[in-house]
Amino acid sequence: SSSAASDVYKRQDKIRPDDGSMSDGFKITENYESGGAGLAGTVDAYSLFADALCNGGVGVTGKRILGEKMIRLFMTGYTTGIMQDDFVVTGKKGYRYGLGVRVLNDTAESKSPVGEFGWDGAAGAYVMIDPVNHISIFYAQHIVGFPKVYSEIHPVIRDLVYEALEK
């Protein structure tokens, strides 16, 4: 059994150290433009980033990392018509697509407020930013090919946080 920090969970239910060759069949070429595919960082660093976003772009040190205008742009949904129809197929009920993020615009099936935004990782990670209540959630998982995480696990995580706050 290995205890190296680079141990990674693989679909075969085995843990093995990353020897630098792990690709899981997912390769990005130089001409692929994406703002987040392959984003790497620590859970702590990512959590601090999410916390800054839910606090108007100001981090825990008091330094501004993003302008309030940008946060408002994130909170605005831009999809309409067929674009919105395509986005709904992802299972994100009540959401529209905003400036690189999903944005909640219908709270019928969510306990979070309109304007909550975030994004999902290709391997199941989940980020939720609620600037209204100054709440951020970062759920880290790395399991490629587990689609139920987006439509079933993420919404439950979100709603459990809000249910806990109601008590």
Model-derived segments and their meaning:
Residues 1-5, 9:
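Single conserved hydrophobic/aromatic residue that forms the stacking wall/gate
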Residues 11-167:
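Catalytic loop of the DD-peptidase/beta-lactamase superfamily, centered on the K-T-G motif
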